[in-house]
């Protein structure tokens, strides 16, 4: 049984309320302080580096306007939904599937919708401060059960909310949402187990699932580990009734929170990054020894900047969120607790998590067997480590000094990375150290050692003091604040040479949006900041985001264009610009000479406008056109990858089953025409496609409308990513959609004038809406029943 576990009802209600808000306030205030210098420096438009700059600011601002109906108009087609399809997301993507991983289910995002769109870039820091505060509040609620003095729960809340994981993941922003909400889920589980509360666990299951379905997979795994470890340690007695209660609330919570789940699952099943079942030894061992060292030290040392490694030259380290560091204390308190307990559930939980971290297939189970390595579940064991730390600090019988010395020696041992002799095989010369970033290494090591020394010193002089918890909390807050400033500063100023003009380009793009020529077309950019197309509300070939339409992930690789977390086809792939209806290219005046040297013919300089340089694509083809020829998939796959964009301007690629049904409307491309693929023939192909293109093409927030007049029945091609959520109508009649060109779309239209409408609604959304709509009133009735029963039995209001 947990040594300090006590019933919640024994805690004075007023005191708990006060301490809860104290935890919230301290964590939020500390976050506000360490963000403040950067907030002032940036004039309120805080920008950091990498994903935060390119995705988080941009996505929050863009989606704030999108959900309010800004941008493209509603579809005029009868019964079409509103705000379901985003043209500014890559080549166009369903908004729910593209953003449910980032923000679409986040309560923090929906809170930000109350603000004007123009405020969002300036509100990123206040929102982050709120998230840190919410994380502290949730951690306090969880931890107070396991301490005698609630001041230690406040201390543990600060350790968790300001942990290395939380500070590191400011870089990704939406990961902090998960850090903030998870403790409430664990607290609610404890309340159901120990206090027999009804409805609370189901509610927080729903909130966490809705917030981020991807992280929820890891939370389910962790809760199973947590439950089994507590059960085997005899922390509670499981009865059939209690198990049924937990199972029912788990199912009910998933049902309430599954609004985004069904569409997300259907989309993920088409995503090649999700799972790789052919790994073999890769299931059991990491390929590089350095990966193991990095994992072990990530629980002890403060984290590196997300995109900079101090030591490691091999393994997957950058951007992985690999840190479980607790500020000031590191693992010293947790190890002290470990040594003082036997058959303890917290020890078992941490031990299982450590094994999972070291076995690839177990590690990947926390994020849906994603084929890429990440450690983005470490926030969960971090909460348990915080609990172990405060338990050790509160117990006067626990030896705190010896574990701290041991952790200190491990930190000092990392100095070997700086002094180990290295021989250059090429020159034969010798040098010392294998450090990749010596300055950052010594800063990180210095903070780690300084924290441990302060920890030992403060424990030595204050442990017998009645205000020990408050003083340690103050020390943790000061240490976390200073380290967070340094950590963010390293990441921010490490890319200052590339990001210093970010705000200027983003704000200039808002002006350019009003000055671009009217019409619905795509754009391209050259060597400017990521996702500028979203500030212009235009579909852009250069896009940085992980969860665009899955068919994009098959279309681009088929052309030899890499597509992992971003789309960035090289400018030398000129034929792709005609195929995808790119009419304008945007760069900066400083990059004009470089662009003209690198690009092929076919671009005409127009003007310098709003800080940008604008070019027109001479080979622009309006969206929606027909072909005279087709090629089979086998022929396409046998062609030269680098010339496939040219081939796609000449012929449509049909799947084998579609050749039988639709090949009659086209002629199979003769072999002689498979080789004549160069720039001059491309310009003629563009002219041919342009001559048989749609007279009207209108983008809307649920898809698009087009009009075309054909001499004979033919397939009309649209360079829009194929998605099961689309329904096509030709002259008002529902029509089959063909998947062509390994990821794009076409429909069959009759001779004469045709009116074409593509209407998007995320596949699976109808079913998820029904489940959620049924589950919510069931939950309300369920909670009301137990509230009523409690009141009847006690004769007083009850908190259920």
Task: Indicate where each model-derived feature is located.
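Extracytoplasmic/lumenal acceptor-recognition loop(s) of multi-pass membrane glycoenzymes
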Residues: 97-101, 479-499, 512-582, 620-685, ...
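Active-site lumenal/periplasmic loops and adjacent helix-entry segments of GT-C-fold
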Residues: 37-146, 151-183, 207-211, 305-317, ...
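Membrane-interface helix-loop-helix junctions at transmembrane boundaries of multi-pass membrane enzymes
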Residues: 236-244, 334-357, 468
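Membrane-embedded helix bundles of polyisoprenyl
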Residues: 27, 128, 132-145, 151-232, ...
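Active-site-proximal, structured, solvent-exposed surfaces of multi-pass membrane proteins
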Residues: 12-16, 659, 665-800
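Contiguous transmembrane helix-bundle modules in multi-pass membrane proteins
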Residues: 196, 215, 346-505, 751-800
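Periplasmic/ER-lumenal interhelical loops and adjacent helix-loop junctions
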Residues: 53-57, 61-74, 107, 242-246, ...
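Hydrophobic alpha-helical membrane-insertion signals
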Residues: 7-97, 497-504, 515-530, 534
